Amino acid sequence: MGYDDRPVLRGVDLAARRTEVVAILGANGSGKSTLIRAALGLVPLVDGQVRLFGTPLRRFREWRRIGYVPQRLGAASGVPATVREVVSSGRLARRGFLRPAGAADRLAVDAALIAVGLLDRGSDPVGTLSGGQQQRVLIARALAGEPELLVLDEPTAGVDAASQQAFAGALADFVTRGGTVLLVAHELGLLEPLVTRAVVVHLGRIVHDGPVPEPAGHHAHPEHDHVHPHAPDSSGMWQ
């Protein structure tokens, strides 16, 4: 796929399987975020096809099965709402807009808030939370919908260590319950132990698909926390 006749992704052939935690890694501008946006139908394809849970994208309607947290989107977004109200909106795809919230919805929202460590902040305005806490609210919103596939675009970018630890715990619980995670990252940080498979994108092409690449040279120094390769190696749920 591409923008204005400029190719962004070329020759991508990729599938994610149930209970995998797949990290899409690469430098800024490599095409990794575009890859997952194309997989969700958020940007059009010039050629090729996408299948979600075995169904061609154009016929897929079961969006409640997917939870998506986009890149750098504040949970407040200018709307005066509490943490619980934002997280509760994640139930709409599952219960519908016309049916009022029931006991199952409230339990799911509580479970999502507990998973990200924000149950005690449920009545607080989202705008009063830190950036990392707002990102945790967005992940809780996605979890509240009880998806089977969780798609996260740079969820830990610029957030504090406590929030990263909360993300890691929430994702570990999600996978334990049979969920699948597709994660875009520039750095994995505390999420690295959860990753079962790493896909490295370089100049719009997949150049590595396997274990998380080991850092090399000065990037392997203990004080350097990069986990992605800075040059390409030689080397389902959606595809």
Predicted regions: what they are:
Residues 125-129:
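Conserved ABC ATPase signature
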Residues 150-153:
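Catalytic Walker B motif of ABC-type/P-loop ATPase nucleotide-binding domains
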Residues 88, 103-121:
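Conserved ABC ATPase "signature" region
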Residues 48-62:
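Conserved ABC transporter NBD signature motif
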Residues 198-211:
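H-loop (His-switch) and adjacent beta-strand-loop-beta switch element
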Residues 146:
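Conserved catalytic motifs of ABC-family nucleotide-binding domains
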Residues 185-186:
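H-loop/switch region of ABC-family ATPase nucleotide-binding domains
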